[in-house]
Design a protein with these regions (language model features):
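Nucleotide-activated chemistry modules centered on ATP-dependent adenylation/adenylyltransferase
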Residues: 1-96
Length: 96
């Protein structure tokens, strides 16, 4: 598994509490059957990534996922429609 710090937005401070929140958020998704998933932390926004063929399943569980993510402190819960991909936090940094 990739380092949890790779899920944190650039410029955001990394704390044990923040890493714990990300770990718990991903555990929630895994417990719902999403073996491959990432929660990218953008402060108050949690961006969920799952493989493209599992996106519909996230939408089906939307209410449960939102409730769990809000309980972890996320105000906004989003689903990345591009699906799971390694290194997605680097995409913004690579832009000219």
């Amino acid at each position: 598994m990739a380092c949890l710090a790779s899920r944190v937005q650039y410029g955001q401070g990394i704390t044990p509490e923040l890493l714990g929140r990300i770990e718990r958020a991903e555990y929630v998704l895994k417990d719902m059957g999403f073996a491959q998933c990432r929660v990218r932390d953008h402060g108050s926004l949690g961006r969920i990534e799952v493989p493209a063929d599992r996106i519909a399943a996230v939408v089906e569980r939307r209410e449960r996922i939102v409730a769990a993510m809000e309980a972890l402190g996320y105000t906004y819960v989003t689903l990345d429609l591009r699906g799971f991909r390694s290194g997605s936090m680097n995409e913004e940094v690579r832009r000219p």
